[in-house]
Amino acid sequence: MDQVVVFQKMFEQVRKEQNFSWFYSELKHHRIAHYIYYLATDNIRIITHDDTVLLLRGTRNLLKVSTTKNPAKIKEAALLHICGKSTFREYCSTLAGAGVFRWVTDVNHNKRSYYAIDNTLLYIEDVENNKPLI
């Protein structure tokens, strides 16, 4: 099976089932170093440990990202999503409203960094332990 198809299925599955420990275990198994999620387009750029770059094209309509930055809203959205109180779509809509343009997940260090459209770092979280780092 094509790598892109495998990763698309993994991302679809974690969005539906919210089984985050399985998801990060699979990313590590496939030697993924980072992935970058772009909220406006739903595109995902995957970078492997051997510097291979894969692009997963988004399937939903474009999402408007606010220029107003609200780190407190980002923290709240992340906590609600991790505990299963919001869907992936709701999570993305809330983040876009809080000024998040993209997030970068460092799979090895279990960190996710949220950035505004001007590349301002808005928030960092520990994705393994579900807690804020800034």
UniProtKB/Swiss-Prot annotation:
To E.coli YbcV and YdfO. This is Uncharacterized protein YcgX. SUPFAM superfamilies: YdfO-like (SSF160419). It holds the Pfam family DUF1398. It comes from the Bacteria. It comes from Escherichia coli (strain K12).
